[in-house]
Amino acid sequence: MPLEQHVIVQADEYTEPEVLDLYRRDGNGEQTTKLNAELINRLDQLDRKAARRRGEERPDKRKGFGRGRGGKGAKGHAPKAERHTPRRWAVVDELNFLGMLPGIYFIFSRNGCDQAVEQCINAGLELTTDEEVTRIRRIVDEMVEGQLTQEDLKALQFSKFRFALEEGFASHHAGMIALFRQIVERLFEEGLVKMVFATETLAL
């Protein structure tokens, strides 16, 4: 299956994310190795907009980097454009809308993975159907039965873990017990968990 490479851009938290091709397409609609001019122009527009919001003008490359003999802005640093990285829940919501799930979102931080799940839950995203929720509960109950005591389940915040699974979300990292990672892998393989926020512990 060919790998489609896209970039999701969001101007701010109040606007819908935009999905743009990373590379240009040829006359046959196939991606080339050249960067998409539309993407470059869009990012440039956002940079200029961010600079205006800060009361700064984007420096003209022909004139150096702005004020002062050093050719730089305040404190000797070139002005930095704001990042245009969409919120994680917004990325998931857009991918779901486009029918591009299940998916894996790699985050190189255990806390980052857990926080991403919470962000999606708090945003009210639900990626599963009633039928899928029933299947998730059955599989989770089967895998947990006899493996952990009630005290263990409480200490591991099992109810929170299970609720996220039922909504279609999961973390996967070395800070989780092996059983929880196995549950996530099983549900993802069966297409029941739609988005996994993972560190390098999840092999493709």
Predicted segments with their positions:
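Conserved interdomain linker/interface between the two RecA-like ATPase lobes of SF2 helicase motors
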Residues: 1-119, 163, 170
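Ser/Thr-centered flexible coil motifs
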Residues: 36, 127-129, 177
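Alpha-helical "lid/cap" subdomains adjacent to substrate-binding clefts that gate access
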Residues: 120-162
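Conserved helicase ATPase core of P-loop NTP-dependent helicases/translocases
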Residues: 150-200
